[in-house]
Structure formats: structure tokens, C-alpha cells
Amino acid sequence: FKKNNNIKIFYGDVSNIKLIKKIFKTSIKDKRKINSIVNNAGIRQRKKFLKLKTKDIENVFKTNFFSIFSIMQIYCLYSIKYKIKSSIVNIGSIVGENGFTELAGYSSTKGALKSLTKSVAVEHAKDNIRANIVIPGFIKTSYFNQFKQDKKKLYNWTINRTPMLRWGESNEVVSMIEFLISDDSSYITGSSFNVDGGWLSS
């Protein structure tokens, strides 16, 4: 890892449980509390349902679901042991809420993640651990310009399909995450929050 003032940055694969445990052990060693975690890692695979193989599904689930499952489990044990008032924010997707062509594997992981979030929220509310999930729509990221240029027809469809007639800005998702990890949301757990310009309501 690299050390920068009071910030420690770890690089690695989120499915590497040894790395995850190392992060928490380091926080204990440095006498720092991890009050919140945001699970944002994910991979997407486009493939027709009848072309999908079990291995394809396993690969997507490994990153999008099982790694987050393990991180949440380790974090809950950590929070309970050190009596930390904690907040977990998972990042879902509108693809996990509605059906999308050629995204059966990806959408399944996001649907499973939403259920996991709610279950953990209910089971560990008594331990002062909150868990919520943010459901972004189409958001402008580094992928945006390439998508707009290479898939103009699909891009125009997403604009027209979204009631607010635009893609979201990344800071609009970040603002929701900041709210959910703050004390301003101290009575909120087991909930999902759509940041999608009205997509799922239309």
C-alpha cells in the first residue's frame, strides 16, 4: 500500500480475502476505526442467455456478489468486536431491478446483492450496523464518451427512456452515498435508493 498523510491506499483484487483482512488488521494496528464501507466493485458481461455457461455466471458472481458477501461478513465481525457504529453502502444497478437483454448474469448478481443488503440490515440492526443499497441509473463515468460515440442509437434510447432526459452526474451518486454513511441517515437501514432520473418509476 501507499501512505499519504493520514490516508492509506490499498490496491488489489476485492475477491482476495487475505487483502481484505489485511486492511482491517492494519486499521486495528493503527488504532483507527472503519466506520463505513462502500462496495462499488463490479464487472459486467454481455452474452445471450442461451450462450451463457456456468463458468460465465461463476466469474461474474465471484466479483459482484461473493467478494462483497465476504467483505460484509468480515466488516460485521470487526464492527461487533470493536463496538463500532457502522454503515455499509452497496452499489446496485437498475439492471438488477428490470430485465435487460444479454445481461442475465450481471442482473442476477445485483438482484442477489439487494437481497443480501436487506437481510444483513435486519439481522445486524441490533449491533448498530446499518446496510443500504444505492441503485444508479445511467451515470456519466469514463465510459460515457465512448458509449455516446460508439453506440449512438442506444445512447439516444437511454436519454429518451429516462424521464429527466439526461444521464446522471457521478457527484449525484456520491451525494447519496455520503448521506447514507453519515449520521444524518442514522435511522435508515435495509433501504434501496434509486439515483436514476426516474427510470424505475416510469
List each model region and its residues.
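Residue(s) in the substrate-gating loop at a strand-loop-helix junction
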Residues: 93
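Active-site loop immediately N-terminal to the catalytic Tyr-X3-Lys motif
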Residues: 50, 98-104, 126, 165, ...
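Substrate-binding pocket helix/loop in short-chain dehydrogenase/reductase
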Residues: 48-49, 56-61, 158
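Short C-terminal tail/terminal secondary-structure segment
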Residues: 98, 178, 189-202
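Alpha-helical segment proximal to the catalytic Tyr-Lys
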Residues: 77, 122-126, 186
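Active-site helix of classical SDR
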Residues: 72, 109, 117
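Active-site loop-to-helix junction immediately N-terminal to the catalytic Tyr of the SDR YXXXK motif
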Residues: 52, 99-107, 119, 147
